[in-house]
Amino acid sequence: ALVADDKQIWFDSSIIAEFLELRGAEPALLPADPLASLNIRQLEKLADGICDAALVIVREQLRPGDLQSEEVLVRNREKIQRSLDMLEAKAAEGKWLNNGQLNLADIATGCMIGYLNFRRVVPNWCVERPALVKLAETLFQRESFAMTTPPAA
């Protein structure tokens, strides 16, 4: 949640991002061009979808072994793999972090990678995805990301 200066509480990542945009955050998290902005939002939702599928896996793995559905686990891992492949292709185009300017898709992707690493639901996700690894390394060097990294267990 975000507590604004006026004590208003904002929650949900997309609402917080929109609040920051409305406040004129610099650099802007979304491009001024509507189509470019829509492309960034689509990548944001792709990263969010990966987190949703990862959460399904986490919850399924919490069930007793004999009640776990292998089909649910496989289906969601496949969703994650396909989505990661799409993000890898976009990251390989080199369009993210141009001139160090962070955007909403970068933030969502960094959060998603952090969640995958924390929960370990997709082992070796990074083996065939060097552009995403490079993006993650760049993001996690930022103070804003480093401050939100969960402590080591």
Task: Name each model feature, range by range.
Residues A1-E70:
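GST-like domain detector, emphasizing the conserved glutathione-binding G-site
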Residues L2, S14, K79-E88, S144:
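Aromatic-glycine hotspot motif
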Residues A153:
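Carbohydrate-binding/catalytic loop surfaces
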Residues A28-L30, W96-L97, F145:
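Short clusters of hydrophobic/aromatic residues that line enzyme substrate/ligand-binding pockets
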Residues G24, A91-G94, E143:
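A general structural signal marking secondary-structure boundaries and capping sites
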Residues A47-K134:
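GST-like fold's C-terminal all-alpha helical module
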Residues A17, E21, R41-E44, L84, ...:
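Non-transmembrane alpha-helical segments in soluble domains
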Residues V127-T148:
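C-terminal end-helix/capping segment
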